[in-house]
Amino acid sequence: MNNNTYHIAILPGDGIGPEIMQQAYKILNTVKNKFKINIITTEYKVGGNALDLEGSPLPKDTIKNCEKSNAILFGAVGGPKWNNINETSRPEFGALLTLRKHFNLFINLRPIYLPIELINLSPLKPEIISQGLDMICIRELIGGIYFGKPQGKSGIRSQEHAFDTAIYHRFEIERIAHFAFKLAQKRRKHVTSIDKANVLHTSMLWRKVVSEVASNYPNVHLQHLYVDNASMQLIRNPSAFDVILCPNLFGDILSDECAEINGSIGILPSASLNEHNFGLYEPAGGSAPDIAGKNIANPIAQILSTALLFRYSLKLNHVAITIEKAVYKALTLGYRTQDIAYNKQKSVNTDDMGDIIASLIYKL
């Protein structure tokens, strides 16, 4: 029996967000009963839904209540309906990026795991993926070109132009590098740092600082790769990677490549953390408005993100392990949602997958 009370802010958002979040509720309720944990969940508006109802993609009440919680469980935001409004009011920018900055969520963590029994999910040849996958992509989340100033547009006709600024401070690189190396110490003790140090000054600083941080972890091997080479090596020999450390832009791109290697972005979870282990947990995929409301979305990424919440913010690793075991047990038993059902495999819907995984948690 755990006597602590944990408050989780639930932000379902737009598109498939609400329906995959319903499956996360099933997992939370199952965990509460199985492990006798006091979990209080409260739902708040975010994204396009909040913009339509309250005039902001991130209402002040949502931020205020997130500040009082132990963690945020996030669905998805955005969709075509809000694509043509002012960019700072668009759900992706006005909600998600603002939350990252507000809570100083500088660490983005995406585990890419595929046991040998499930290598048929990967689009790669069996001989390439024969050892399965077990790597983690660590992405610096609130620095780099997405947040650098100035940025904007100017000029008219042939002189029309746009500009962004890539900037990294030493402290931003140091703190994310320390996190990556500490994580690697608990795993296979290998960090691959991604940059473009043959061209970009930000990457030159990145490589220098990461190398300096590495000296504090003599038992961890450091490898530097240019981002273009890294994208090729991930296809050629993904099993060689352990912890991948990336600046914001490169991490954004490579982590999605990792998702496809894994079989589907619908099974890839994500955690965004600050130095106090407060985190926002969300599926790596988007709001998928084209399949919203059809009960065919894959809830596994949302469920595995819930597992990460227990591991990193609530420090209940045994709960996280149980959830993860239930997910991979369901997949090993042959249950598939439409996006990962191949060779005429019968697929189950969103609700059924949530029920199956919840029932397996009870049995483990």
Curated annotation (Swiss-Prot):
Any idea which positions bind Mg(2+)?
D228, D252, D256
A Pfam family name for this chain? Iso_dh
State if rRNA-binding is listed as a keyword. Answer: no
In this chain's numbering, which residues are marked as the site (Important for catalysis)? Y146, K196
Cofactor binding comment, as recorded: Binds 1 Mg(2+) or Mn(2+) ion per subunit.
**Residues annotated for substrate binding in this entry:** R100, R110, R139, D228
The protein, known as:
3-isopropylmalate dehydrogenase
What this protein is reported to do is described as: Catalyzes the oxidation of 3-carboxy-2-hydroxy-4-methylpentanoate (3-isopropylmalate) to 3-carboxy-4-methyl-2-oxopentanoate. The product decarboxylates to 4-methyl-2 oxopentanoate.
Q: Which residues does the annotation say bind NAD(+)?
A: 79-92, 286-298
One GO biological process from the UniProt record?
L-leucine biosynthetic process
Q: Which reaction does it catalyse?
A: (2R,3S)-3-isopropylmalate + NAD(+) = 4-methyl-2-oxopentanoate + CO2 + NADH
**UniProt-listed Enzyme Commission number(s):** 1.1.1.85
Provide the protein's localization.
Cytoplasm
Which of UniProt's keywords are assigned here? Amino-acid biosynthesis, Branched-chain amino acid biosynthesis, Cytoplasm, Leucine biosynthesis, Magnesium, Manganese, Metal-binding, NAD, Oxidoreductase
Q: Which InterPro entries does the UniProt entry name for this protein?
A: IsoCit/isopropylmalate_DH_CS (IPR019818), IsoPropMal-DH-like_dom (IPR024084), Isopropylmalate_DH (IPR004429)
One GO cellular component term, please give it: cytosol
Subunit-level organization: Homodimer.
* MF (Gene Ontology): 3-isopropylmalate dehydrogenase activity; magnesium ion binding; NAD binding
Pathway, according to UniProt? Amino-acid biosynthesis; L-leucine biosynthesis; L-leucine from 3-methyl-2-oxobutanoate: step 3/4
Family per record: Belongs to the isocitrate and isopropylmalate dehydrogenases family. LeuB type 1 subfamily.
Q: What class of enzyme is it?
A: oxidoreductase
Cofactors that this protein relies on: Mg(2+); Mn(2+)
